A protein has these predicted regions:
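Active-site beta-loop-alpha junctions enriched in small/polar residues
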Residues: 1, 35-41, 70-71, 95-99, ...
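Active-site-adjacent beta->alpha loops and helix N-cap segments on the catalytic face
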Residues: 1-24, 44-48, 69-84, 164-174
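Active-site pocket-lining/capping segments in soluble small-molecule metabolic enzymes
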Residues: 11-37, 81, 85-139, 144, ...
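A structural motif
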Residues: 29, 62-63, 154
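Short, acidic/polar
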Residues: 45-56, 138-148
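Conserved, mostly hydrophobic/aromatic
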Residues: 57, 61, 94, 157
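Short catalytic-loop micro-motif centered on adjacent basic/acidic residues
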Residues: 64-70, 156-159
């Protein structure tokens, strides 16, 4: 979380992920995952710098990376191409967040800088004021994203369920004949 006064780093804390990764490596043989940002970190001015920092994390010993949420799979595929071009060959888990309320979308995108494609914006605009319909539409959109990822060879996917196990269960039910 962002410190209340906005000052980084706090005393006794890490200023870069590599510092944490290196300390964890010293503690034992752990599998270490890290975050990555297919649309670029919200505070990063240039995408190439973002990939350079990701490469540093990988070189420090990260075993896999999980992406920040995205709503357009082409962004993920392009990101995957760009990092592979830079020699980042570890597993990449796409992060899919089922948006179940209009408020959740606004808050999540404000924090992450994630772009909302027109197709999804139309869904939120149409169903956003009906909680049950928005929840079902958000689950359907996330399911469609996952189906596309699977069809394009992605085998491991992280679902940001946001402490809503029923949402994850609904997605798994939707995929029950696809993922066996």
């Amino acid at each position: 979380d962002i410190p209340q006064d906005g000052q980084f780093p706090l005393p006794g804390q890490y200023s870069h992920a590599c510092e944490l990764i290196e300390d964890i490596k010293k503690m034992g043989d752990f599998c270490i995952g890290a975050a990555c940002y297919p649309e670029g970190h919200v505070e990063m001015e240039h995408k190439k710098d973002d990939i350079r920092y990701l490469k540093e994390k990988v070189d420090c010993g990260v075993d896999f990376i999980t992406t920040q949420m995205f709503f357009n799979n082409d962004i993920f595929y392009n990101f995957l191409y760009r990092i592979r071009e830079q020699g980042i060959m570890i597993p990449v888990l796409p992060g899919i967040m089922p948006i179940t309320t209009k408020k959740q979308l606004a808050r999540s995108c404000a924090l992450s800088g994630t772009a909302v494609p027109q197709r999804f914006r139309a869904i939120v605009d149409y169903f956003g004021d009906d909680p049950a319909a928005m929840k079902q539409a958000g689950i359907a959109y996330a399911t469609d994203q996952i189906i596309d990822l699977i069809a394009n060879g992605v085998r491991n996917i992280h679902v940001y369920s946001m402490n809503k196990p029923e949402v994850a269960a609904a997605i798994m039910q939707n995929l029950s004949e696809i993922v066996k």
